[in-house]
Regions:
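Conserved structured core elements
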Residues: 190-193, 222
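Long, low-complexity intrinsically disordered regions
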Residues: 159-162, 176-181, 188-191
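A secondary-structure capping/hinge motif
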Residues: 179-185, 228-238
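Alpha-helical bundle regulatory/interaction domains
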Residues: 1-146, 153-154, 160-162, 168-172, ...
């Protein structure tokens, strides 16, 4: 499971407003100090101390208080779907309290465990067992879905969904249904997310945005700009100019 889950501590000493871009993972976060809000200005809403953000189609703005420390678990939606009691399309583009999915007692225990791990200075990886106790793994019944994900990634998001379903020996409607309930997106949307990730992977080796668009799997510059704007709120030129000094990471 280690290749499907990443876990780390995040410590923001100063108040911070930051944007999270769509990525291929969902995020479970537990604040051991401080709080995080979703949105900015009058529209902001304080999130619960233990929450989950599903797979995103567009950018999300978060605000962290001074001295906020969080344990963050990045997890593939396919794996998460075997741990939670609701279809993944119910948590797409949403940030929910873990109490919406599990008992109050279980979440209180999890928060206490994470606070103890913080106090003891434990490595993030040592706390993973606490999440595994809360989230027992159900059996994988739709074996074609992990295969579909691998093929979409292997093609860099340039794959026909009808042909993919045929190669996997399932109907296109079964593939679509499986993706919505287990990933939270349609196969086409997921392929778009893979292409979006390619932009950051190939950015440093591309000599121009035109070359980058083709390398990342977009069929022309207009397609690239349109899709990039949907996922960031900016044109590629604007975004890379503003983020020239930042590490290119599409997650927290």
């Amino acid at each position: 499971l280690s290749d499907l889950i990443r876990i780390s501590w995040s410590h923001k000493e100063s108040p911070d407003t930051y944007t999270v871009l769509p990525g291929e993972e969902c995020v479970i976060g537990v604040q051991t100090k401080g709080r995080i809000s979703l949105g900015s200005g009058k529209q902001s809403k304080t999130l619960s101390k233990a929450g989950i953000t599903g797979i995103l189609r567009g950018p999300r703005t978060f605000i962290s208080e001074k001295n906020t420390k969080s344990l963050l678990v990045y997890i593939s939606p396919l794996l998460l779907s075997r741990m939670i009691p609701v279809p993944m399309d119910q948590i797409s583009d949403s940030s929910l309290s873990l109490e919406d999915l599990f008992s109050k007692e279980a979440i209180s225990g999890l928060i206490a465990d994470c606070e103890e791990a913080d106090w003891k200075g434990q490595e993030a990886s040592l706390t993973l067992e606490k999440f595994r106790r809360l989230l027992p793994l159900k059996e994988e019944k739709e074996k074609f879905l992990p295969q579909a994900i691998l093929r979409i990634k292997g093609s860099l998001g340039e794959i026909g969904i009808k042909g993919l379903a045929s190669d996997l020996g399932v109907s296109q409607s079964s593939l679509e249904r499986g993706f919505r309930s287990r990933v939270g997106l349609s196969p086409k949307e997921y392929a778009g997310l893979v292409r979006f990730g390619n932009i950051f992977r190939f950015y440093n080796s591309s000599s121009s945005l035109t070359e980058l668009a083709l390398e990342a799997g977009y069929y022309d510059q207009a397609h690239f700009i349109r899709e990039f704007k949907k996922k960031t709120g900016f044109s590629p030129k604007q975004w890379f100019r503003q983020n020239a000094n930042l590490g290119l990471d599409s997650n927290f």
